[in-house]
């Protein structure tokens, strides 16, 4: 399940970048609308990347369960906590992008 940990870290990085680009888009909204649109698109792409990585984490967890391998309770608790943080982060980024 090391790959789940690595995917979780990558998802976090993608979301951090998405937030950074969303904030840059908002900052440039009235200064340079074309640049603002570019930053908004970059943010959306980072969100798409995080979604693709998330789908892979879910797929790997499901595949392990289908083999009869259940993650330890502590690992599941960490994943659940990380997953909740990811959902909150995505919501924050989408809120930023909605201000454009």
Question: What is each stretch, according to the model?
Answer:
Residues 1-100:
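Non-heme di-metal
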């Amino acid at each position: 399940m090391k790959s789940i940990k690595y995917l979780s870290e990558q998802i976090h990085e993608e979301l951090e970048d998405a937030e950074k680009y969303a904030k840059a888009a908002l900052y440039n909204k009235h200064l340079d609308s074309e640049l603002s649109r570019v930053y908004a698109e970059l943010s959306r792409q980072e969100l798409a990347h995080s979604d693709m990585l998330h789908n892979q984490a879910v797929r790997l967890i499901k595949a392990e369960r289908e083999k009869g391998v259940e993650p330890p309770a502590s690992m599941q608790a960490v994943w659940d906590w990380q997953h909740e943080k990811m959902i909150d982060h995505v919501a924050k980024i989408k809120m930023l992008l909605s201000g454009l």
